[in-house]
Curated annotation (Swiss-Prot):
GO cellular component: bacterial nucleoid; cytosol
Function summary: Binds to DNA and alters its conformation. May be involved in regulation of gene expression, nucleoid organization and DNA protection.
Region spans: Disordered: 1-25, 87-108
GO MF terms held by the record: DNA binding
Record keywords: Cytoplasm, DNA-binding
Protein name (database record): Nucleoid-associated protein PA1533
Pfam families (UniProt xref): YbaB_DNA_bd
Database matches in HAMAP family: DNA_YbaB_EbfC (MF_00274)
Species assigned in the record: Pseudomonas aeruginosa (strain ATCC 15692 / DSM 22644 / CIP 104116 / JCM 14847 / LMG 12228 / 1C / PRS 101 / PAO1)
Location of the protein in the cell: Cytoplasm, Nucleoid
Cytoplasm among keywords: yes
NCBIfam families: DNA_YbaB_EbfC (TIGR00103)
Length: 108
């Protein structure tokens, strides 16, 4: 490979790394809302899986503790699934031009 070609590849790799870093920051800062019980429980979570807020409908204050715990767990799980889906959608656009093997996961 010629010297200029190698320099071009290195520059391209550096640009790709910068874009990847920016994409990872965007994904980490994204917020999603997971819900359960037809919206009676909602959880706001960041792309880093940090729970920022849990909201409970007032009507749930009369419910059995176990029901409430199940609804909170379901809302958290819903938020996690939404983060994973969001990450896959964003990264598929980023990696669409790359020749990656099937099932290859990007680093996160």
């Amino acid at each position: 490979m010629m010297k200029g070609g190698m320099a071009g590849l290195m520059k391209q790799a550096q640009q790709m790394q910068e874009k990847m870093q920016k994409m990872q920051e965007e994904l980490a800062n994204a917020e999603v809302t997971g819900q359960s019980g037809a919206g009676l429980v909602s959880v706001v979570m960041t792309g880093r899986h940090d729970v920022k807020r849990v909201s409970l409908d007032d009507s749930l204050m009369q419910e059995d503790k176990e029901i409430l715990e199940d609804l909170i767990a379901a809302a958290v799980n819903d938020a996690v699934r939404k983060i994973e889906q969001n990450n896959q959608e964003k990264m598929s656009g980023f990696t669409s031009g790359m020749q990656l093997p099937p099932g290859f996961k990007m680093p996160f």
